[in-house]
Amino acid sequence: MQNTLQRGDRVLVDKLTPWFGAEPERGEVVVFHDPGGWLEDTQAPEPNVVQKFLSFIGLMPSAEEKDLIKRVVAVGGDTVECKKDGPVVVNGTALDDKSFIFPGNTPCNDEPFGPITVPEGRIWVMGDHRQNSLDSRYHQELPGGGTVSNDEVVGRAIVVAWPINRWATLPVPKTFDQPGINATVNTAMSLAPGALGLAGAVPLVLWRRRRLTRGRTAG
């Protein structure tokens, strides 16, 4: 997810609104459980006392869970594709992702894909460090065809909370608001004043499978 997020960052995750039936929206950064096979060769780090306590009271995903963080690019019913040297296209509308993908990356030159129709109740996710991310593109052989069930989503990452000098919100990039994408506005996802009370500070270093490709490591 670099440069949007850096290794060691902690993010606040809105875990409240999914309880009321809200679903992930295009452009959001979400934390989700391993759908199965995405982190199969990753070993769990030993949780510290603070992490165990936060997990116990519900302010943080369980240390035993395998969680990932990616950006939602397409939702159920969408058609998404990306050809070599081209942009990511959702429902026929090209995304301008220069504002959030890693500098020097291309939208998908390392792994072109599609067109793919995302099943209802599932999402297609991609990392912002496109040439260094094991995302939906690399799991199309698994059940779900690389998509993630909405039921696996822990919540939306809304703020980089730590370290202090990196504090920043994580808004949805404007390119996902283009009329042609036909984004559905889910009012339940709007953060109420009390929503942050059930947010968890998720350390991005907990579960992170690294991809080795031509001498590069993944994040």
Residue ranges and their predicted role:
Residues 3, 7-219:
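Soluble "head" domains of membrane/secretory-pathway proteins
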